[in-house]
Amino acid sequence: MGKDFRYYFQHPWSRMIVAYLVIFFNFLIFAEDPVSHSQTEANVIVVGNCFSFVTNKYPRGVGWRILKVLLWLLAILTGLIAGKFLFHQRLFGQLLRLKMFREDHGSWMTMFFSTILFLFIFSHIYNTILLMDGNMGAYIITDYMGIRNESFMKLAAVGTWMGDFVTAWMVTDMMLQDKPYPDWGKSARAFWKKGNVRITLFWTVLFTLTSVVVLVITTDWISWDKLNRGFLPSDEVSRAFLASFILVFDLLIVMQDWEFPHFMGDVDVNLPGLHTPHMQFKIPFFQKIFKEEYRIHITGKWFNYGIIFLVLILDLNMWKNQIFYKPHEYGQYIGPGQKIYTVKDSESLKDLNRTKLSWEWRSNHTNPRTNKTYVEGDMFLHSRFIGASLDVKCLAFVPSLIAFVWFGFFIWFFGRFLKNEPRMENQDKTYTRMKRKSPSEHSKDMGITRENTQASVEDPLNDPSLVCIRSDFNEIVYKSSHLTSENLSSQLNESTSATEADQDPTTSKSTPTN
């Protein structure tokens, strides 16, 4: 590889710096964000509707409860089906011809986001039914989640930590296992590949650091405002730019992948803490309905980037909070020096009266419960609110907008199949597609036995790198370089009710695959 822009952009050091900076930036914005201390009810666009639809605001009547449960179950089922066949196969596969969504790749992530979309749609259908009744206004589904902003932001911080840590670890794991940069980190790679070093380190570091992170975040054991003592306090503009750069870094992690934007290379990314690059879950009860064996198959790469896009949702919500932040909407007010104060008095938060949510009123009135001024019971933050206009704050989205445009540009021009290009599974990998037959079906096959079974070798799809072996019992597609007499013999001697072929990296027919 020549030392051009791509060489340095995708260099191991560049990738690891970006991956670990995202972790630091997410902790920093959580600490600086005044919304993290707000006692008001959390609201998240779209996701809040889905959460409220499934978890709370259930009417008292049994019939209404059953109706609500049936609707969100139907929404989930519709989302899964539409995500698989409409969005993944039709839109991404056939219409847009995206290589990264070839075959069944990326289907579970598509189905997840499709499910969120249909939960949002069905929540509005449910609201329409409630409005038709006329007396159910209290149960209308909105983007308010029924939990405090403080609690939600703590959950989001733990979630982003888990997602960012797994992502950073997978990037590190890939850098230390693969060899596009053979002269980089030779000693570290030698240590990393010894025995179970990478497995042991992952689980040890994950358990230890996650325990510390959860303890610090949930118990407020460490107060950021007491720790930094107002050193370089942030305002809504700087926080908006920080949130924007977090979005940029999330996209950079994907764009720095050596196989971006097609993800069709021969690099298998091992799942963190495991020896395998993919996970498979057998669904045995489907065998009674279908004649084939179905498995859920998730590859390490889609496991990694699926997590990134989940974290991206939380980061987008963080950016939204900074752009449209108004102190009184979050039970906060501005004191001397443009510092933010958080109201913790539940009585003052009932109606969010702007008169009571002010420095003048709270510093001159006494709380009868404590016999102290209201200000003394409020939380002081070093974060500032300078009242910047929306136009200025929206400038922070420019870096993210540029990143999204470049992301889409590379996918559109370099990550799509040509109209006449065959869209087949990655030819660099061996795979197996086995058609199972029940014993009753075999008994009807005119006395076919192992002794008189015939096998034929064909050239599938006119591709010399693959060899297709057909017999009366199964169909196997091998990479030609992997085919040996032992492989052929073991497959033909396998029982029809046995598990899938034993060749690495062969897999049974899987639907869907990520």
UniProtKB/Swiss-Prot annotation:
Question: For side Cytoplasmic, which residue ranges?
Answer: 1-15, 87-110, 176-198, 261-295, 416-514
Q: Name one GO biological process term.
A: intrinsic apoptotic signaling pathway in response to endoplasmic reticulum stress
Extracellular topological intervals: 37-65, 132-154, 220-239, 317-394
Mind telling me which Pfam families this protein's record contains?
Answer: TMEM117
Establish whether keyword Transmembrane helix is in the entry. yes
Subcellular localization, per the record? Cell membrane
Consequence of mutating N371A? Reduced N-glycosylation. Loss of N-glycosylation
Coiled-coil zones: none
- Kindly report the protein's main subcellular placement as a broad class: membrane
Keywords noted in UniProt: Cell membrane, Glycoprotein, Membrane, Phosphoprotein, Transmembrane, Transmembrane helix
Bilayer topology term: Multi-pass membrane protein
Q: Using the record's annotations, give every residue carrying the modification Phosphothreonine.
A: T453
- Recorded superkingdom: Eukaryota
Q: Where are the transmembrane segments?
A: 16-36, 66-86, 111-131, 155-175, 199-219, 240-260, 296-316, 395-415
Q: Which InterPro entries match?
A: TMEM117 (IPR029370)
Residues of this chain annotated as glycosylated in UniProt: N353, N371
Instruction: Give positions of region: Disordered.
Output: 429-459, 486-514
Q: Which GO terms describe its cellular component?
A: endoplasmic reticulum; plasma membrane
| Compositional bias per record (Basic and acidic residues), positions renumbered to this chain | 438-448
Q: State the family it belongs to.
A: Belongs to the TMEM117 family.
Give the protein's function. Answer: Involved in endoplasmic reticulum (ER) stress-induced cell death pathway.
* PANTHER family with a match to the protein in the record: TRANSMEMBRANE PROTEIN 117
Q: What is this protein called?
A: Transmembrane protein 117
